[in-house]
């Protein structure tokens, strides 16, 4: 079977907080694959998925459900049961990478820089009372802090706390998305994202993308609203810094056991250090997303999508 005759089923949408982004990602990938001569179809992640797989009989499945069950290994576990090759990490590795505290602990143990953090479950607040918990942890905290859900993406539920008053409201917001939250030391610097793809010869780091916003806060609106952010591709880095951050991204991709593609996010501080923030097993593919921008800087997003599908199809 030639590469161009491959049938690709793209799973997007679902009942997650990132549904809209997922649907837009799915449509863009489908268009890119069609441009390359593939038969591509987008289906919603709902109760009709099993029949869609049976009817379309894809050679490859590309899951693009962002957040929660789309990236925590749940969807990947279902796809394992189909016996059809799918794009992305295995269930165990997706689960590992999607849990930010666990991923940070593993990366930190390998000697790579990552900001200090603590992770807290909502159950702790219910049992001890929010005021008591915050009183116990505040003495050991240094503000400002970044408060975020322990899993999920698109910066949903993420905010910066400059003092104890901010911390309380920030945690309420984060807990509205996830039952576990992470308090992370704020590192001033530039947002740098490095996308990684697996090829025959091993992982390849695409050109780093730098994101600049007016208020320095790369939140949901800044990520998915045109003109809210300024992008530099490649990032404004020296040759040595470029090599360092790409090498770190590949190291993290391999350390977490990620497969096919990933996006590794860093903060570059004023001293030239790169601080690992998180790893994305199903990066956004919208017009303002970082993976497509890196792919276009390499050559062609359409061609990158095609190469990923062809690589995955070999696992059949």
Each PLM stretch: what is its role?
Residues 1-12, 96-189:
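Active-site nucleotide/adenylate-binding loops and adjacent lid/helix of ATP-dependent enzymes
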